[in-house]
Amino acid sequence: KNIYGPYEWKTVLTQGETKINGPHQGAWVDTTTGEDWFLHFQDVGAHGRLLHLQPMKWVDDWPVIGIDKDEDGCGEPVLFYKKPDVGKKYSVCTPQESDEFNSQNLSPQWQWNANINEKWMFCNGQNGYIRLYSYPVTDSYRNLWDVPNLLLQKISAPNFTATTKLTFKPTKKYTGERTGLVVMGLDYAGLFVENTKDGLVLSQSVCDEADRGSLEKTNASVSLEGNTVYLKSTFSTMDRKNAGNEGGYDLVVMCKFSYSMDGMTYRSLGI
């Protein structure tokens, strides 16, 4: 074999009869004990891209990934398999989801919508909160796709509820400043607290095809008597597939929103 060629190609992993669409864009990894494995992603629509780990072996100088049931040199991905042998045992754990912000640094599940600017936030771990600072939008602003200082985390499960308590202290000399809780994607929906000329207003808004520059639509709004509010989003995966979209796991997702002034009694708002 020569690094300069000639080159050959061969399909060594395909969806086959599984529900794992794709699969593609991955990397070969090996363990300290000599095992071979393959990492790849699966596009699951609103849930983002799931990471899969597949067993891998070498047959006649070609990698065979997943399970090769018919022994034709092309495997299918698996959902369940024995764990890699990494030389020692580790306890079962899951990525962090909740956060009381009791550290001076952001927990690793958080990510920004753009390259981080340290002026966007201040972590007050001693008192258990994070302070987020707002910045003016650009003249070309269309929707939140144009906003870099969104603090986000990946979808953690097919069904879950996210709740946050926030206190909004807008700059009094400006109107239009806002904050809130958003489920962000190609489309997005959320609860937004805005400083208006009539005081603080909580709105439930959506933006379809946000990635294409669409404008937000407000479904419902209420005036707030105080500046501390609890916001809740219930994320549910429905048992029906998005029409025309690829993948057995690309299912319709629904989000419902509610709010509370005391953290106990919640009222639905919007969709």
Regions found by a protein language model. Give the residues of each.
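Carbohydrate-active catalytic/glycan-binding domains of CAZyme proteins
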Residues: K1-I271
